[in-house]
């Protein structure tokens, strides 16, 4: 079963809910870093947050990145995964993909369902 890390802004609950459902339907295992919820208490926990995220990315086969709005953490997670040879697929929500997004992503998809299909493969 393909493990897929959900990269996205911390408050993107709807993205995480929809992506989780679509990934399950596609036979993938979503890995949501927000289950380790650090919202409102990041100060002093930066190392734990980042190292936890990196370890989870390393444990996955792919990253589904929500690039519907700018987010520093999402960009760093996608860049890290790309550098490790882990497949990255970007969900843009119809927003123009930034050149860096195009560079690191195997596919940039306007629709979340299309992004999941690109990850799940044949």
PLM ranges: what are they?
Residues 1-122:
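Conserved catalytic or regulatory cores that recognize and/or transform ribose-phosphate-containing ligands
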